[in-house]
């Protein structure tokens, strides 16, 4: 939920950045696309801690993230901690985090050499939408109804936020 050793301690998390990194590198080297949760703006997240977290984040082979900004909940230990982070600062940090992971995801998709295995889930504006084995979105132009089908794609274009293909 964070990539700063100090922040994990403040958040009372048991995982460790270096052991997490080793695990993620191992899984990534075996062809897995990886994602994680990340809490932005938790009390105590100083500028120094944020800088360390972003430096560490660049080292992680992540392709997806479920990021959210901390929201105070009465009755929790975090709610009474000093150094609450202002919303505008948390928003800037959130956007920085999303940009880093979006870039990592784009590079992952650009460098992928495996055929995509895609489950087509819906059709929108005449295009079929599905997710591949790496949980990346793929938009397919097809004259054939593909909803509910598994398709295998090896010729596709990598766009900023998705892959695009034509099914013949």
Regions found by a protein language model. Give the residues of each.
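Conserved non-cysteine loop/helix-boundary elements of the Radical SAM core domain that shape
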Residues: 1-64, 75-89
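Terminal RNA-binding accessory module
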Residues: 80-168
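Short, ordered loop/turn segments at secondary-structure junctions
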Residues: 70
């Amino acid at each position: 939920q964070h990539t700063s050793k100090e922040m994990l301690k403040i958040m009372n998390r048991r995982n460790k950045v270096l052991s997490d990194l080793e695990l993620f590198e191992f899984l990534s080297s075996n062809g897995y696309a990886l994602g994680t949760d990340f809490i932005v703006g938790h009390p105590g997240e100083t500028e120094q801690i944020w800088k360390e977290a972003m430096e560490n984040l660049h080292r992680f082979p992540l392709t997806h993230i479920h990021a959210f900004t901390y929201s105070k909940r009465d009755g929790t230990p975090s709610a009474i901690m000093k150094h609450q982070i202002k919303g505008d600062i948390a928003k800037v940090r959130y956007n920085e985090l999303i940009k880093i992971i979006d870039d990592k995801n784009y590079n992952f998709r650009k460098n992928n050499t495996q055929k995509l295995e895609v489950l087509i889930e819906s059709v929108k504006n005449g295009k079929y939408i599905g997710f591949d084995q790496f949980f990346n979105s793929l938009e397919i132009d097809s004259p054939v109804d593909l909803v509910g089908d598994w398709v295998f794609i090896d010729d596709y274009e990598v766009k900023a936020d998705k892959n695009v293909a034509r099914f013949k």
